């Protein structure tokens, strides 16, 4: 056996050649000698390893290599490991080259006992299946590694393709030139510039391009008003819209302020337009012209008393201001130039340019006074300038502190303002004196200490009826023992405009005249005067500066819009209870009334020319039978139900309905 395993063929050439020869008989083929083939394979591997060690040895004797062949115990462990990995499906491309099961299939499948000539096919099938899995994984590993290399070569070729083509053309065209060296691929072409690029997801990359577009498209798919563009765009500076998600409002505002410069605009070209507007103001100031007749029908008692006087009345009291202002006015020859050009007509205010001269302004207002009713100006004697704005602000809000408006727990208590309670003298005399009610004194409780000893003391150490009562709650709600955070909120913000923080909406105090009761306003504060009377507050020493009429109507800090016209409530008589009416019976009753004999001729001039086959709806309702079965009572049948039934009859029997000019009757013509 040892001689057959020797790797040197020179010692025993005869024995080796005799074993390698094929059988000489061409007719009979014996069984294949597996043992001989294994011995030959082992000898060849040993010789090859020995030759390899001799060639690569450098000045020293080759080391004694261990026998690469596994013994029986190692082969058994390899078989068990491969079968376990195959059953658990853990054979992959990483460990497939470490499993040498394919090289030892013969040793595993061979017959263990010499006396047993049968082969274990179950063991052979499991071994073959594990070998197939190992081989397939090796094929996949070779395929993937090869394509990785090809992919790297292709990518490098695309990057440097243009450079190589130019270099090749230069070599072919140029003579006696050296071959250009090939460029090396830079490792930076295969590396990412930052770690964020490696961690980012495809979903985030898609939104990083244009997040506003993705958000808008997602909301648009939902339907409704959420997908509208203005609902998704940001707004800054009042009404400026941010169309780009990368825009910064601060930079846009700063750039816009650089271009904004105060320039003087010449408004002389609108002189004729303003004159025409003033002339046509009476024609266009009515929203619903059809309601003019209804308003004129109101009684004089229902109309509000006028607090104004006519512009045509030349009164010296209208422009007499004696409330601390020393403003002087010029003669009447200057027209309306000095005291302001604004006027108030029926609760509407308008302005005229002050650049119009005195001679140009007079004919405009005189024509307007001749064509329409005289305009009205509010009585300036009934109003006063702003007084003690701080007192009005804090007292009206129920706050007593003016510094920080923070007084601990008392800060949340609302205190009523002390307003002047004015009662007429007649009511004070007629009302009887109120009787003072005395409070009953409560009896002081007496403590009986002897009675407490007679009572049985509870057993505090007794076990509880329910043991769960001794358990503490798992989570307790935190106790609110701290005062709220002081936001330092200023009460002035309540009366400031949101878009115009410098403008404060304040009322004006009204000075009461002696001997007159204030029937025009229910409280001590009334709304602003006409927009033109700015001279009243020129010398005011209040906390606010004079605006000198440099703002528009919408930004005036000294005036408010006048109170709208109030109309008394009109009681409308309508049914307040539900009624049951049989419409079919009502239609039959109306049709029977229409088919009766012709009605007598009407002496009224409006119905004198009616044809004989016509009926009056008013007369029809007057002659309605009392025994109608359409409702329990005849009063339950209303005219509008009869009119609805009449419309049905007109469609069914081809009737024609004609109304009257006064809208108080309806004529029915039979077909």
Curated annotation (Swiss-Prot):
Residues 536-556 have a biased composition (Acidic residues). Mostly expressed in flower buds and flowers, and, to a lower extent, in roots, stems, leaves and seedlings. It is found in: Cytoplasm; Chromosome. GO terms for biological process: cell division; mitotic chromosome condensation. One of its GO terms (cellular component) is condensed chromosome. Regulatory subunit of the condensin complex, a complex required for conversion of interphase chromatin into mitotic-like condense chromosomes. The condensin complex probably introduces positive supercoils into relaxed DNA in the presence of type I topoisomerases and converts nicked DNA into positive knotted forms in the presence of type II topoisomerases. Essential protein. Component of the condensin complex. This is Condensin complex subunit 2. It comes from Arabidopsis thaliana (Mouse-ear cress). The gene is CAPH.
């Amino acid at each position: 056996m040892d001689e057959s395993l020797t790797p040197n063929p020179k010692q025993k050439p005869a024995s080796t050649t005799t074993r390698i020869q094929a059988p000489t008989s061409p007719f009979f083929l014996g069984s294949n000698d597996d043992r001989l083939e294994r011995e030959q394979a082992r000898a060849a591997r040993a010789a090859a390893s020995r030759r390899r060690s001799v060639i690569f040895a450098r000045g020293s004797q080759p080391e004694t290599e261990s026998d690469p062949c596994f013994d029986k115990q190692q082969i058994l462990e390899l078989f068990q490991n491969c079968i376990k990995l195959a059953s658990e499906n853990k054979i992959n491309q990483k460990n497939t080259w470490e499993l040498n099961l394919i090289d030892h299939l013969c040793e595993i499948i061979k017959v263990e006992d010499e006396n047993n000539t049968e082969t274990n096919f179950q063991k052979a099938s499991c071994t073959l299946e594990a070998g197939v899995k190992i081989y397939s994984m090796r094929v996949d590993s070779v395929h993937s590694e090869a394509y990785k290399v090809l992919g790297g070569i292709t990518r490098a070729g695309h990057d440097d393709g243009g450079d190589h083509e130019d270099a090749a053309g230069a070599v072919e065209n140029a003579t006696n030139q050296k071959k250009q060296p090939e460029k090396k691929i830079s490792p930076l072409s295969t590396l990412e510039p930052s770690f964020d690029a490696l961690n980012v997801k495809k979903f985030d990359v898609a939104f990083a391009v244009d997040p506003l577009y993705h958000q808008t498209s997602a909301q648009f798919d939902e339907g409704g008003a959420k997908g509208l563009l203005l609902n998704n765009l940001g707004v800054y500076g009042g009404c400026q819209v941010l169309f780009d998600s990368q825009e910064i409002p601060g930079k846009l505002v700063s750039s816009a302020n650089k271009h904004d410069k105060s320039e003087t605009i010449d408004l002389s070209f609108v002189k004729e337009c303003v004159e025409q507007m003033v002339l046509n103001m009476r024609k266009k100031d009515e929203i619903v012209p059809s309601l003019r007749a209804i308003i004129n029908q109101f009684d004089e008692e229902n109309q509000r008393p006028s607090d104004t006087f006519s512009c045509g009345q030349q009164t010296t009291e209208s422009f007499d201001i004696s409330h601390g202002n020393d403003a002087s006015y010029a003669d009447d020859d200057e027209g309306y130039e000095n005291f302001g050009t604004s006027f108030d007509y029926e609760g509407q205010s308008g302005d005229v340019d002050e650049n119009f001269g005195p001679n140009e302004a007079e004919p405009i207002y005189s024509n307007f006074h001749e064509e329409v009713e005289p305009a009205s100006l509010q009585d300036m004697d009934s109003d006063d300038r702003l007084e003690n704005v701080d007192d009005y602000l804090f007292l009206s809000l129920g706050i007593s502190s003016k510094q920080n408006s923070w007084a601990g727990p008392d800060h949340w208590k609302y205190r009523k303002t002390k307003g002047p309670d004015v009662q007429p003298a007649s009511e004070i005399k007629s009302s009887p004196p109120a009787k003072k009610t005395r409070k009953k004194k409560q009896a002081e409780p007496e403590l009986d200490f002897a009675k407490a000893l007679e009572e049985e003391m509870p057993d505090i150490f007794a076990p509880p009826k329910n043991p769960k009562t001794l358990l503490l709650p798992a989570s307790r709600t935190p106790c609110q023992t701290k005062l709220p955070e002081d936001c330092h909120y200023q009460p002035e913000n309540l009366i400031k405009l949101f878009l115009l923080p410098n403008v404060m909406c304040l009322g004006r105090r009204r000075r009461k005249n002696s001997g007159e009761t204030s029937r025009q306003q229910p409280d001590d504060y009334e709304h602003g005067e006409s927009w033109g009377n700015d001279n009243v507050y020129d010398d005011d020493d209040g906390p606010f500066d004079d605006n000198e009429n440099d703002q528009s109507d919408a930004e005036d800090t000294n005036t408010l819009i006048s109170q709208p016209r109030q109309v008394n409530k009109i009681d409308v008589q309508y049914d307040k209870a539900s009624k049951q009416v049989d419409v079919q019976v009502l239609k039959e009753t109306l049709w029977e009334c229409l088919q009766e004999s012709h009605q007598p001729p009407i002496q009224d001039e409006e119905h004198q020319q009616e044809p004989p086959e016509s009926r009056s709806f008013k007369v029809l309702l007057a002659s309605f039978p009392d025994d109608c079965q359409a409702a329990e009572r005849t009063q339950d049948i209303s005219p509008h139900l009869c009119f609805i039934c009449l419309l049905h009859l007109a469609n069914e029997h081809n009737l024609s309905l004609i109304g009257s000019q006064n809208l108080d009757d309806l004529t029915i013509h039979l077909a």
